[in-house]
Amino acid sequence: MPKMKTKSSAKKRFKITASGKVLAAAAGKRHGMIKRSNKFIRNARGTMVLAEADGKKVIKNYLPNGL
């Protein structure tokens, strides 16, 4: 059976660290920021580490061969 292909959309959105954690950009920052608190905007900057269960799903289903 051939190897499963990596999803191109996931390549752009996720990064796997050396320890196996999955990094992703914070959600909810596209529009409507005027009503958000400054704390939310500050904390949503940069990347976030996905929860362990979500990270495993991403790796298994979308990034089977890593990046």
UniProtKB/Swiss-Prot annotation:
Annotated Gene Ontology cellular component terms: cytosolic large ribosomal subunit
PROSITE patterns with a match to the protein in the record: RIBOSOMAL_L35
Source taxon at top rank: Bacteria
Protein name listed in UniProt: Large ribosomal subunit protein bL35
Recorded family membership: Belongs to the bacterial ribosomal protein bL35 family.
Single annotated GO MF: structural constituent of ribosome
GO annotation, biological process: translation
Record keywords, A-Z: Ribonucleoprotein, Ribosomal protein
Cited SUPFAM superfamilies: L35p-like (SSF143034)
UniProt xrefs under InterPro entries: Ribosomal_bL35, Ribosomal_bL35-like, Ribosomal_bL35_CS, Ribosomal_bL35_sf
Any Pfam family hit: Ribosomal_L35p
Source organism of the structure: Allorhizobium ampelinum (strain ATCC BAA-846 / DSM 112012 / S4) (Agrobacterium vitis (strain S4))
